């Protein structure tokens, strides 16, 4: 599906452009070596030397990490030293490749300018200084890419928790509760745009407890019938939703089930607590990823996707006015328009039959002599 239908500010998943640029650099470097007329065997030897140096440097860095992880074998690796070694050193093929290449250069002839012991000492010095000076850390973009790829973001956990612990429980029975509500309240939620749960996603994570304070044109009307579910040892845990009336120019313009996405309160509280180490920029990034992840989850669950609509918005910071009630009305009317389009009957008007479309008929005259084609001669 396209990323993202919710809001232009929500980022798309990262692609593979970095690998494409690396491929361009690879082709450019090969062209430079070809123009310089460097002997291929000389290029391959030094290329293998650099690869061996890189692998050896990674091994030294990982051994330093292993020294720390061995102190946490019981708590982090269930007492398995092998798991700790694998977590730090990774695939042993890299280590074997480094050893083979190092041995190759040690026994290589005609390389008087290359001393393995000198290279090893210089490499250890470089890696030690790099770790002490903090030169080995990833850039913020690399950290963000790794967290998104491995699903390690705070937003990923919040989105799944919100879906499994709340939306998956209430959305399947939402239509039955709406029908019960309509029987008691004169079909208040009978409109095509009123039969869904509208969830508000302010990207600044400002989630007040009273919607009428945010916008006086959003007025509380009533509560849907409660849903009781036995959950995590809690008998008859109550889930409830609120029905709001939306005003436009002082007149009722729509009725819907409306609420904020409560995990946004968690993100806001984390950004206010210094112990969480969560900056305002982190909060904005995680709020966007939370919306995108929840959209991806709902996209694969039709019974949940068809019962709710996400309203993602970002209030302008340049002083321009923003009306939450108008934003909600826009989504309600869009929902009604989509509902009418989906339910419109597929009718087609058949063209009137023409003479050429009729079956051919054989006309036989009862006269003895044939008549001419020109009627003016009769």
Curated annotation (Swiss-Prot):
Modification comment: Phosphorylation by TBK1 leads to activation and production of IFN-beta. Following cyclic nucleotide (c-di-GMP or cGAMP)-binding, activation and translocation from the endoplasmic reticulum, STING1 is phosphorylated by TBK1 at Ser-365 in the pLxIS motif. The phosphorylated pLxIS motif constitutes an IRF3-binding motif, leading to recruitment of the transcription factor IRF3 to induce type-I interferons and other cytokines. The phosphorylated pLxIS motif facilitates SENP2 recruitment during late phase of viral infection. Phosphorylated on tyrosine residues upon MHC-II aggregation.
Lumenal side: 35-44, 107-115
Motif annotated as pLxIS motif, chain positions: 362-365
Result of altering residue 337 to R: Abolished sumoylation by TRIM38, leading to decreased stability
Region (Mediates interaction with ZDHHC1 and ZDHHC11): 1-189
Disruption phenotype: Defects in innate immunity. Death within 7 days of herpes simplex virus 1 (HSV-1) infection. In addition, mice show a remarkable reduction in cytotoxic T-cell responses after plasmid DNA vaccination. Cells fail to induce type I interferon production in response to dsDNA and infection with herpes simplex virus 1 (HSV-1) and L.monocytogenes that deliver DNA to the host cytosol.
Any GO BP: regulation of gene expression
InterPro entries: STING, STING_C_chordates, STING_C_sf, STING_LBD, STING_TM
Localization per record: Endoplasmic reticulum membrane; Cytoplasm, Perinuclear region; Endoplasmic reticulum-Golgi intermediate compartment membrane; Golgi apparatus membrane
Primary location: endoplasmic reticulum
Residues noted as binding 3',3'-c-di-GMP in the record, renumbered to the chain: 165, 237-240, 262
Crosslink position(s): Glycyl lysine isopeptide (Lys-Gly) (interchain with G-Cter in ubiquitin): 19, 150, 235
Activity regulation summary: Activated by anticancer drug 5,6-dimethylxanthenone 4-acetic acid (DMXAA).
Name the UniProt record assigns to this protein: Stimulator of interferon genes protein
Location of the region described as Cyclic dinucleotide-binding domain (CBD) in the Swiss-Prot/TrEMBL record: 152-339
Molecular function via GO: 2',3'-cyclic GMP-AMP binding; cyclic-di-GMP binding; protein homodimerization activity; protein kinase binding; proton channel activity; RNA polymerase II-specific DNA-binding transcription factor binding; signaling adaptor activity; ubiquitin protein ligase binding
Gene Ontology CC terms: autophagosome; autophagosome membrane; ciliary basal body; cytoplasm; cytosol; endoplasmic reticulum; endoplasmic reticulum membrane; endoplasmic reticulum-Golgi intermediate compartment membrane
Gene that encodes the chain: Sting1
Signal peptide (UniProt feature, chain positions): none
């Amino acid at each position: 599906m396209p990323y993202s239908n919710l809001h232009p500010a929500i980022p798309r998943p990262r692609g593979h452009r970095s690998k494409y640029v690396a491929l361009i650099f690879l082709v450019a470097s090969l062209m430079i070596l070809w123009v310089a007329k460097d002997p291929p065997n000389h290029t391959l030897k030094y290329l293998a030397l650099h690869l061996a140096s890189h692998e050896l440097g990674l091994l030294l860095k990982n051994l330093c990490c292993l020294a720390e992880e061995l102190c946490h074998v019981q708590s982090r690796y269930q007492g398995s030293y092998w798991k700790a070694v694998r977590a730090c050193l990774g695939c042993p093929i890299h280590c074997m490749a480094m050893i083979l290449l190092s041995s190759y250069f040690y026994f290589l002839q005609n390389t008087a300018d290359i001393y393995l012991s000198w290279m090893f000492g210089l490499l250890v010095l470089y890696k030690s200084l790099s770790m002490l000076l903090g030169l080995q850390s990833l850039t913020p973009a690399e950290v963000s890419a790794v967290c998104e790829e491995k699903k390690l973001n705070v937003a990923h956990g919040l989105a799944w928790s919100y879906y499994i612990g709340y939306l998956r429980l209430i959305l399947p029975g939402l239509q039955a509760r709406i029908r019960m509500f309509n029987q008691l309240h004169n079909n208040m939620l009978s409109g095509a745009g009123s039969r869904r749960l509208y969830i508000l996603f302010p990207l600044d994570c400002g989630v007040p407890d009273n919607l009428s304070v945010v916008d006086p044109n959003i007025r509380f009307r009533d509560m849907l019938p409660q849903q009781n579910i036995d959950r995590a040892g809690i008998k008859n845990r109550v889930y409830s939703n609120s029905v709001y009336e939306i005003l436009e120019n002082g007149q009722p313009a729509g009725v819907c089930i409306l609420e904020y996405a409560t995990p946004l309160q968690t993100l806001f509280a984390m950004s206010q607590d210094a112990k969480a180490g969560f900056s305002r920029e982190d909060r904005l990034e995680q709020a966007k990823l939370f919306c995108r992840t929840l959209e991806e989850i709902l996209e694969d669950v039709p019974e949940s996707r068809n019962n709710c609509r996400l309203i993602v918005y970002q209030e302008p910071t340049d002083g321009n006015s923003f009306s939450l009630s108008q934003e909600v009305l826009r989504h309600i009317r869009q929902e009604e328009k989509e509902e009418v389009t989906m339910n419109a009957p597929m009718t087609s008007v058949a063209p009137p039959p023409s003479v050429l479309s009729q079956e051919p008929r054989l006309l036989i005259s009862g006269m003895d002599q044939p008549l001419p084609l020109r009627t003016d001669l009769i």
